[in-house]
Amino acid sequence: MLELKSISKKYGVTRALKDVSLTLPQGQIVGLFGENGAGKTTLMKCILGLLSHGGTITLDGASINEKNIERLSFATCEHSFFPALSPKGHRDFYQAHFPRFNDKRFHALMDFFELPMNKPLRAFSAGMKNQFEVVMALSQGADYILMDEPFAGNDVFNREDF
């Protein structure tokens, strides 16, 4: 279970999050909705340990750390991959660093989205980059998959594929 208790975050004097508490059981699909600037991305970055914050975040009762972070994956429209690497290069990197990486799922999703294996990511369109973010998040073998606007930049047909 992913549990957030009284999460708060400020950027200078601007309060991005105030006393946010959530309990997310494994396997549940949850959507966060809010206006631009409401703190959705900030909350996800706090969960992943990318931002300091007030309050506590635990995964099955333990603080998120280097021992359990592999149980979380993240897909973002900010494109968090290495632009010079191809999907094949990313797969090789992830296989080396994420023991639970699912190569069969990776290939099935690459085929589903018809993404090229050997083209550098910097040559992908915005929509293709978003698809690849989702491929990597779903292939990592994580128990919890966080997605931050994974459909941004995709046309309506690609959104239906997702």
Residue ranges and their predicted role:
Residues 30, 41-50:
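Short, conserved post-Walker A segment of ABC-type ATPase nucleotide-binding domains
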Residues 33-35:
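The feature captures the beta-strand-to-loop junction immediately N-terminal to the Walker
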Residues 49, 55-68:
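Conserved ABC transporter NBD signature motif
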Residues 76-132:
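ABC-family P-loop ATPase nucleotide-binding domains
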Residues 145-149, 154:
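Catalytic Walker B motif of ABC-type/P-loop ATPase nucleotide-binding domains
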Residues 156-158:
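Helix N-cap at the start of a conserved alpha-helix in ABC-type nucleotide-binding domains
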